[in-house]
Amino acid sequence: MISNFAISRIEGKIESQDSLANQRFPKLNINLDKVSSNNNKLNVDYTFAADYLNGDSEDAKSIGYLKISGTIEITESKEKTVEILKRWDEKHSLPVDLAEEIINGLNFRCSSAGTLLAYSIGLIPPLVISMTKVQEKQ
């Protein structure tokens, strides 16, 4: 269960004011950078990135970006914490239910914070409206 959500770094940049008229909805990416533990608490370092382009083609040029980084704290039993860390170290993945909770939490919080940042520099808000479902690799 997520017990704390912290944003430690926010970046935003536009290439030029003129390019804003051609922006498209951003390409969004959530990366879970690192998973570590402190007793029965897991710390998941993350990066939420929104890349803005001037078109949809492969040769589209970047017109700006938003990047939000931080740490999510998750409280679990000692046994569950050890199990999750072992899985992360071996497969670089998390249990499906935990991954869904983290990704949906990040979508909500980073979309909210990203909207304020995007508005301040003239970019389209990086809103994710639907819930994310995670599936095990087959």
Each model region followed by its residue ranges:
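N-terminal intrinsically disordered, cationic/polar leader segments
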Residues: M1-G105, Y119-Q138
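Helix-rich interaction surfaces within compact, conserved domain-sized segments
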Residues: I103-N107, S111-A113
